A protein has these predicted regions:
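Sec-dependent signal peptide recognition
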Residues: 2-9
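Inter-helical turn/loop segments and adjacent helix faces that build the functional surface
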Residues: 163-174, 234-246, 297-305
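Alpha-helical scaffold segments in carbohydrate-active enzymes
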Residues: 38, 42, 65, 85, ...
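C-terminal motif of bacterial Sec signal peptides marking the signal peptidase cleavage site
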Residues: 13-16
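Bacterial lipoprotein signal-peptidase II cleavage site
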Residues: 18-22
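Extended ligand-binding groove/face enriched in aromatic
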Residues: 76-77, 88-209, 214-216, 326
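CBM-like carbohydrate-recognition segments
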Residues: 24-57, 64-104, 110-128, 269, ...
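Oxyanion-binding "anion nests"
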Residues: 226-274
């Protein structure tokens, strides 16, 4: 009887130790892996866009991170099917456009992972990137530099740097430094520590200037998520002693410090970073990239854990609450170039899944 009484007394404690309760379950490693596999498999079963498209470039970036985390054969086979069978290791048709380069990041990841490395896996990437760094960009309107929009900083820099590191060719790293600095000086607001999406959102002091309803500047959540996510993928490749690495680390830390100030109470960021009241409802793709970038920084000791951990935890919990029972991730703003209100719990896109998978791949590594 005494033994039974003690068992009943300590049963709640035993259960609490073995089964995560409430929000704590979102940080359980088994749960994270299961959720990453579920969301990846849902997205595999619901393809969207050309497999060479930038949207899928972001998705497969998350897919490779998910494979590294889970070692799921389904995920790896889907990536190989995309690269080898659907795309035949080719990039998009626009040699000059970073959107058509991003899928090559996954080609390089697969090349590194494969024991049987074949030259054809990276030949088209080599041909395209050589042309990109040696020939002029076909300039028109706001397209005054090669990376003229901030989204390009996810698409282009990791591609050039990853290729340069993979092939041992420093000219691609040097080209990245040049083009990145051009974009930085064109679009980065050194007071707000955020990027304008493109020249249409840079204040010139004339009738073309654009502001939010509250009078603040327009800084798009996903656009800045692209930048921070791209910085992580860039920094993961650059050697510690690379001469220009301090520039990227400084920019990364500046943006992270600003981004956590703009997180909303529910853990997500709004489509417009400086006018959240005009855009009710969190936006998952930008929030996913922010969560990924912040978690990576804490894991790599680039960000102070005590300062950033609360924001990371809130973001990861909120992101998981946007995943339905089937594994579909909702509240993703559709393709665009600025903040919009045109999304809901039923709105999904492949890059939203990619951002979620990237975030999960870092959350599982840390103590959040």
């Amino acid at each position: 009887m005494k033994a039974e009484f003690l068992l009943l007394l300590f049963l709640p404690l035993l259960l609490s130790c073995s089964e995560p309760e409430g929000d704590a379950m979102y940080f359980n490693k088994k749960y994270i892996k299961q959720t990453m596999i579920k969301t990846a498999e849902w997205q595999i079963a619901h393809p969207n866009h050309s497999q060479k498209d930038w949207t899928n470039g972001a998705f497969y970036a998350g897919m490779f991170a998910a494979w590294e985390t889970t070692r799921s054969k389904t995920i790896y086979d889907a990536m190989m099917s995309m690269a080898r069978d659907s795309n035949q290791w080719l990039l998009g048709r626009r040699w000059y456009h970073a959107d058509d380069h991003v899928i090559a990041q996954t080609y390089m990841d697969l090349y590194r992972a494969e024991k049987n490395k074949k030259p054809e896996m990276l030949q088209a990437t080599f041909d395209t990137l050589v042309k990109f760094i040696t020939e002029p960009y076909p300039v028109r309107r706001v397209e005054v530099i090669k990376w003229w929009w901030c989204d390009a900083l996810f698409m282009g820099p990791p591609t050039l740097v990853k290729f340069g590191i993979t092939m041992g060719e420093n000219r691609f790293l040097a080209a990245n430094d040049l083009y990145y600095q051009e974009c930085y000086h064109l679009l980065y607001n050194k007071e707000e520590h955020l990027f304008a999406r493109d020249l249409n959102y840079v204040i010139r002091g004339d009738s073309t200037d654009r502001y939010e309803a509250n009078g603040k500047l327009i800084f798009w959540s996903r656009g800045n998520g692209w930048v921070l996510g791209g910085l992580v993928r860039l920094l993961k490749e650059l050697p510690e002693n690379y001469p220009n690495r301090p520039f990227y680390e400084k920019l990364y830390k500046e943006m992270c410090a600003r981004v956590i100030e703009l997180q909303q109470a529910d853990g997500l960021w709004r489509a417009s970073l400086l006018d959240p009241d005009s855009y009710p409802g969190g936006e998952v793709s930008g929030s996913g990239f922010f969560c990924y970038a912040l978690a990576w920084g804490v894991n790599e000791n680039l960000l102070e854990a005590e300062k950033y951990r609360p924001a990371i935890k809130k973001a990861w919990i909120a992101l998981n609450k946007c995943v339905n029972e089937e594994g579909r991730i909702g509240w993703v703003q559709p393709i665009g170039a600025d903040p919009r209100r045109n999304f809901s719990a039923d709105s999904w896109e492949v890059y939203g899944t990619g951002a979620f998978l990237l975030a999960g791949s870092e959350i599982i590594k840390g103590r959040f």
